[in-house]
From Swiss-Prot:
This is Large ribosomal subunit protein bL20. It comes from Rickettsia akari (strain Hartford). GO terms for molecular function: rRNA binding; structural constituent of ribosome. One of its GO terms (cellular component) is ribosome. PROSITE patterns: RIBOSOMAL_L20. Gene3D superfamilies: 6.10.160.10, Ribosomal protein L20 (1.10.1900.20). GO terms for biological process: ribosomal large subunit assembly; translation. Keywords: Ribonucleoprotein, Ribosomal protein, RNA-binding, rRNA-binding. PANTHER family: 39S RIBOSOMAL PROTEIN L20. InterPro entries: Ribosomal_bL20, RIBOSOMAL_L20_CS, Ribosomal_protein_bL20_C. Belongs to the bacterial ribosomal protein bL20 family.
Amino acid sequence: MTRAKSGKISKNRHKKILKLAKGYRGRANSCFRVAIEKVEKALQYAYRDRRNRKRDFRGLWIQRINAAVREHGFVYSQFIGALKKAEIDIDRKVLAELAVNNSDGFASIVEKTKAHI
């Protein structure tokens, strides 16, 4: 009986990894042993940074809201506290969008919260 070496299976696995490694520098795009390490590390970075992206965007929204609120004489933390007391349920993403693109709408929200500070 002949020896089965899983030729087709391993070739497909190698092809899959090398396809993911396309565009890498040096031997990482052509040598399977190097490519598999680089692809695994890249997937780890992608997994980590998908979570970090949420953190980064929240920070960006807070910075934008803080800058817009300071033009009206408030601080971010006071403004968010006043929003909660006024029972205005708008998330930070929408507030930042209003602050950047619709300053009149944002100003009206700030006016509604002034009574609750």
